[in-house]
């Protein structure tokens, strides 16, 4: 189900992530979108975003997103949410307890749906 309002992106992301559905996650991004998968890193384009999202999915945790802000101006929207990933396992075997406040930009498509253009999953954290 596509997002017909920008604020729907968070719920759709949470649903697809918790279902382990990388293709449903990818359907939320423009082909040339960018994702910040960790502070100081940038994944640009479909292949890089898919690989980054797969890393998070491989943690096998559950994610929750709480929308904090949506500012819509014309065909652009700025969004923020607080996300947390719990119940999974990091590659070293330690518990996966991750979370941050995001900074995201979405764009209205010609078909009336909204897709991510920029998804900074670590919007409130500086690069190391």
Where are these regions (language model features)?
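A beta-strand edge to alpha-helix "cap/lid" segment located at domain peripheries
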Residues: 1-24, 34-128
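Short glycine-dipeptide loop
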Residues: 31
